[in-house]
Swiss-Prot record:
Protein name (Swiss-Prot/TrEMBL): Ribosome maturation factor RimM
MF GO annotations: ribosome binding
Organism, scientific name: Ehrlichia chaffeensis (strain ATCC CRL-10679 / Arkansas)
Signal peptide: none
One record GO biological process: ribosomal small subunit biogenesis
HAMAP family for this protein: Ribosome_mat_RimM (MF_00014)
Chief place of localization: cytoplasm
Quaternary structure, from the entry: Binds ribosomal protein uS19.
Alphabetically ordered keywords of this record: Chaperone, Cytoplasm, Ribosome biogenesis, rRNA processing
Coiled-coil region list: none
InterPro entries: PRC_barrel-like_sf (IPR011033), PRC_RimM (IPR056792), RimM (IPR011961), RimM_N (IPR002676), RimM_N_sf (IPR036976), Transl_B-barrel_sf (IPR009000)
Family listed: Belongs to the RimM family.
Length: 175
């Protein structure tokens, strides 16, 4: 996927019998999901209309041309993207897009480089930062919280990490 595309959401399931889909949105406000025009999966484009907002990050939507549950079921796990230049620019230093974090150096409070950000995941409960450790081919994953990552500087390409207390073997962690 090109770096200039930002994922706005993913279809989690069909909804009903008339081709509606349930979409998990990654926008700050669910109603913004369709505010940026036509969406793409990287190959095809889609016109999406919000039917209802279920929760802070779940919407029911109709996709143009999808008219049956069978059609909708075929789209399960499809991700929708928009060109980054169609999105508003962050207005504060503490605002950023998650895609801007990929590749940033992860720096300990003593200024030693711990690694760099490989990927950001969300397995349901919270966002997880995957870090490729320096001096190793290993990766580690930590929850993306203010306690663990108190400072992000996208312009200077680094993020500060305060390592949490670890239960069990922490021999891979170099402080």
């Amino acid at each position: 996927m090109e770096n200039d595309l930002i994922c706005l959401g993913v279809i989690t399931s069909s909804h009903g019998i008339s081709g509606h889909v349930k979409i998990k949105t990654f926008t700050e406000n669910p109603e913004d999901f369709t505010s940026y025009g036509t969406l793409t999966d990287g190959i095809n484009t889609y016109e999406v209309e919000i039917i209802s907002i279920i929760s802070q990050n779940i919407i029911i939507a109709q996709i143009k041309g999808i008219v049956s549950r069978t059609d909708a079921d075929l789209l399960r796990n499809k991700k929708f993207f928009v060109e980054k230049n169609k999105l508003p620019n962050p207005t504060n230093d503490d605002e950023f897009y998650y895609s801007d974090l990929i590749g940033l150096n992860v720096v300990l409070e003593n200024n030693n480089v711990y690694g760099n950000i490989k990927k950001i995941h969300n397995f349901g409960s919270c966002d997880i930062i995957e870090i490729r450790l320096s001096n190793s081919k290993k990766s580690t994953m930590l929850p993306f919280t203010k306690d663990i990552f108190p400072y992000v500087n996208v312009k200077e390409k680094y993020i500060i990490i305060t390592l949490p207390e670890v239960i069990g073997n922490n021999s891979d962690i170099q402080r």
